[in-house]
Amino acid sequence: MASNRYHSINEIMESQLFYQITTPPKKTQKAQYDPEVEKFLEIIEFVKENGREPQKVPTDLTERSLASRLIGIRKDPDRMEYLKEYDEIGLLEVRSKELTIPKISSIDDILKSGLSALLGDNLNNDITRSIFDTSSLQKVTTMPEYVAKRKKIKDFGKFEELFKKCHKEITEGKRKILTFKNEQDIQSNSFYILKGVLLYVEDVGERKKAKGKTNARLRCIFENGTESDMLLRSLSAELYKHGRRVTDNEDTLLDNVREDDVSTGFIYVLKSLSTDPQISSIKNLYKIGFTTGSVENRIRNAENQSTYLYAPVEIVTTYQVFNMNASKFETAIHHALANNNLDVSILGANGKMLVPKEWFVVTLEDLQAVIDEIVMMVHLYD
């Protein structure tokens, strides 16, 4: 085990080890994001959170920037047309005309403008029309009657197993994490990852066409126990920026292994069959190791090897690793479970004291969660 010890998944993800895990990296096409759309969505997010449009306040540079950006968009018909499909709250439906009134700074200016016009004898001229036409004034933005927000879900229990199963299938290679490319990929009973959080689209409501674009109300369940009934186009816009698509489960692991996938080894989990009370009395004790060959061959003659505590072992489960450095992957698991490492000295059958390595006191459920999270992060940053 390396000298540097990490005690959480976050520490691993921020370390050099994480980049070593992804060697050799899988070559995937990077998503191309539209900065114009991304900046407009920042304005949408501000309005949702604050219940008002951004203003040019002197004390908040971020809000001033958003306000200036919105003004610039509204002044440009081409930009408004381009962005209107992402405008779920009606920001771009505002229309304002400039109020043009002659500059009056003296009696002569008034007389030159025409006394009868100012007194109302001729209300058809441009000046008086502009004075009495209230449509030229800035309209108040009308917020939509309903904006989707996340809320705690009451029946999360029935979805919890779905998330666990999805994690397991990703780890086993039965599901892939791919770049999100098409909003039509959003279907009911499908999984996505948004800003690192797994979400499940339970239902897609009736699809309706507006302004030439199809939209629908969704029921999205998030792994953190919240739900949202956001619109399909809103979710797709977020997934383009910060998300990935999780493929459907394949019937078998082999069906989902591509020709260009490279197997780099196996991670194995073993249980000791030792009759020594020092070992057999420890509940949830497992060895987590790595081999490039057969696991069965690796554990032959286990009773004569100190790494297996001079006792036979039983294979609990194995994971075949594709497209990443299996040895570094094993190291990452060990670091993540550093606090669960068996830290005792045991008297071996040969009379010598043993300090077990790569043995951890951890439930299989917790071990699976650690592996799932590491695999998820590798796919996200691949």
UniProtKB/Swiss-Prot annotation:
Domain of life (superkingdom): Bacteria
InterPro entries in alphabetical order: Phage_T5_Orf172_DNA-bd
SMART domains: T5orf172
One Pfam family cited in the UniProt record for this chain: MUG113
Protein name (database record): Uncharacterized protein YeeC
Organism expressing this protein natively: Bacillus subtilis (strain 168)
